[in-house]
Amino acid sequence: MSDSITIFDTTLRDGEQAPGASMTVPEKVHIAHKLADLNVDVIEAGFPISSPAQTEAVTRIATEVDGPVTCALARTKEDDIDAAGEALADGTDTRLHTFIATSDVHIEAKFDKLGNTMAEKREAIIQRAVRAIEQALTYTDNVEFSAEDAGRTDPEFLCEVVQAAAEAGATTINIPDTTGYCAPSEYTDLLETVVDCLPDPDAVTLSTHCHDDLGLATANTLAGIRAGARQVECTINGIGERAGNAALEEIVMALTVRADAFDVTADVHTEHLTPTSQTVSAATGFPVQPNKAIVGSNAFSHEAGIHQHGVLEERTTYEIMSATDVGQDAEQIRLGRHSGRHGLFNRLEAMGYAVPEGHRDALYDRFLDLADRKKEVFEEDLEQMMNDFGGDAVAAATGLPDNGVALNGGTPAYRLDQFSVHLSSDDEAKVSVRLQRDDGSAREEQATGEGPVDALYRALDHAVDAPHTLVDYSIRSISEGADAQGEVEVTIRYGENQFAGTARNTDVIRASAEAYVDALNRLVAAQEHAESVEFVQNGIMHTYGE
């Protein structure tokens, strides 16, 4: 059995299923380049049958991103397999991943047309899996099969399914704990059962895919490795459906720091973990909690006096890995208004941003404007500055999404032109706002409310044509000092879908306005490019239309 672990990153597919985490195509391509820098083995880029945007993302990543295998997801349906195969057609190193549910609860809920009895339905599921694998092999010789909700599947039936899948030619067999139900010992037993029933365990790669509903995703993944799995499916920051997926950074560093306990290797460039985490956070609008293992801002911080003393004397007293090993700074480099161009662009290059010479003047002016509003500029500020910086040339050279790009890389429907706030002595606020439309028109509205943010959002609601409901508003400081930037996150709902917007500014009222407009643009873009993906609470992806 190999001692090398295949890292299968599904941030762009399963990670995007987290409510509000939808990403534009340019954002996905940018993240895929970051994942390539990280040296992951496989990037699951999307689910092509679901929408043109998903197809475009898969095709662009397959043709533009060198290094990792590009994977596309498909149900065990002919149209799905064809859509995935065609999206991958121009790629040089590709995989097609097909799946079908195998647990009794899924079979009873989703497969009425496959038979009258459970036995008939199970037999039909095996036949569909085999046909799908055979069809997928006409597009690529790298085919993965997943038994959705394997964690709650009858072990005997699971063995029948994976045996048939292996005999049909699947090269990777994935055993998902789709609902995060398994305990580590149970998941170990399940994978050992699968290994024992495979006709030739060395002929296929056994894979894990663990969700975090009980907080056990990383533990179950590591248990799966001990049971013989040699591929792990995971996401940056652990994002994903419901409580999320196993976090790539946690798995990789567990295997690195505790190599003695697992005796396997993952060839990941760990110094890129934190920069990649920050990129995904900026694209999705999901902040990384400070105490998040490996990539959180507090992961290498010490406040207790005895800990500080110990670390100053010898870092290994309280640290089992180095901050620099995972791309965090042992000592934060601070920039300010007196920082020169050399210092700024050296720092940006260290963060992974190679800005073309022709665009450096504009970016340096943006930096000076920020530095004038803040005494010190931190890495978090620079990350957001680069995420916000517009221009097709810079976007092409750096992989950055253009400023304000909507889904599929289109022009955003709304741009905040100007606004003003007037406060009265009785705490009532009056706001005037002007929005610029993508057709060149502008609309001005006024509103009053209980405080500036309430009034601002009422005015914006009057100025837009997209019906929606405000679900959540939060603000936090994302850099240091009294002049710190505030990051505002806004979530709005339209129907069953949620859309998240974020913005950062030293002026939190402006950040509140820009975050709301960001969320509105994502809503409008989603309506224009009507995604046909259907998500459910308890699955990898809803198997609709069966």
From Swiss-Prot:
It comes from the Bacteria. GO terms for cellular component: cytoplasm. SUPFAM superfamilies: 2-isopropylmalate synthase LeuA, allosteric (dimerisation) domain, Aldolase. InterPro entries: 2-IPM_HCS-like, 2-isopropylmalate_synth_dimer, AIPM/Hcit_synth_CS, Aldolase_TIM, LeuA/HCS_post-cat, LeuA_allosteric_dom_sf, LeuA_bact_synth, PYR_CT. Residues 5-274 form the Pyruvate carboxyltransferase domain. It catalyses: 3-methyl-2-oxobutanoate + acetyl-CoA + H2O = (2S)-2-isopropylmalate + CoA + H(+). Gene3D superfamilies: 1.10.238.260, 3.30.160.270, Aldolase class I (3.20.20.70). Residues 415-546 are annotated as: Regulatory domain. It is an enzyme of class 2 (transferase). Mn(2+) binds at D14, H209, H211, N245. Its main location: cytoplasm. One of its GO terms (biological process) is L-leucine biosynthetic process. The keyword Metal-binding applies. Pathway: Amino-acid biosynthesis; L-leucine biosynthesis; L-leucine from 3-methyl-2-oxobutanoate: step 1/4. Its cofactor is Mn(2+). One of its GO terms (molecular function) is manganese ion binding. Its EC number is 2.3.3.13. It is found in: Cytoplasm. Belongs to the alpha-IPM synthase/homocitrate synthase family. LeuA type 1 subfamily. Homodimer. HAMAP family: LeuA_type1. Catalyzes the condensation of the acetyl group of acetyl-CoA with 3-methyl-2-oxobutanoate (2-ketoisovalerate) to form 3-carboxy-3-hydroxy-4-methylpentanoate (2-isopropylmalate). This is 2-isopropylmalate synthase. It comes from Salinibacter ruber (strain M8).
